[in-house]
Amino acid sequence: MDEQEIREEVALAERRATLYWWFASMLCRELDSDQLNTLCSESGRVLLDALAEEPSLAPGCQKLRRALAGVQVLATPQLELAADYATAFLGDHLGSAPPYASVYVEPGGMMFQHPHQQMVQWLQQWQLAVSFDGNEPADHFAIMLDLMGNLVLKGVDSPEAQSAQSALLAEMLPPMRRWVTQCQRQPGFYAALAELLLAFVSLDQTLIEGEFSLAQ
């Protein structure tokens, strides 16, 4: 691999990691005023336009744009979104869609199942601390996305981190698909965000599996 190819690989990894961290920041807690203003600004539009250039992400981007347009006409958009966040994610699995992988791996929606234990192990292995408010289970999708962003950057020069990306996606995607389906029971911003997230993660899995198979 020549110097130009290395620079391109690093730049791609930085873009992927940034997107994983962006989605994590959207999910980890209610949006603050700065996040909402940025999302509704020119930079937010540019981000969604760039994502929409990928055909598999275009429908999700369009839904998120429509949801944002609806939010912007509200009298108190940040407060309304905070209420939507609570309704969407903070109830039990019967009435909302808690963003924890464990809830979707076994009937009954139990917390602290295998995905949580696996994430604790991975976070320790990669010496990463959870920077969340409160005492979140380690399999919160935002924590899993944050870890993925770190593995993407480490994977530029670490075959072990490349393999870890595939393992994390295999752990995360099946429960995420069920979670996204459950999110659609509460239409609006977070349902649209979840749908776009799933499209992005699914696309990334396809891309890295193709890259790793070619490298073998």
UniProtKB/Swiss-Prot annotation:
Coiled coil: none annotated. Transmembrane segments: none annotated. Keywords: Chaperone, Cytoplasm. GO terms for biological process: protein complex oligomerization; protein folding. Gene3D superfamilies: 1.20.120.1820, HscB, C-terminal domain. One of its GO terms (cellular component) is cytoplasm. The keyword Cytoplasm applies. It is found in: Cytoplasm. Disulfide bonds: none annotated. NCBIfam families: PRK04976.1. This is Chaperone protein TorD. It comes from Ferrimonas balearica (strain DSM 9799 / CCM 4581 / KCTC 23876 / PAT).
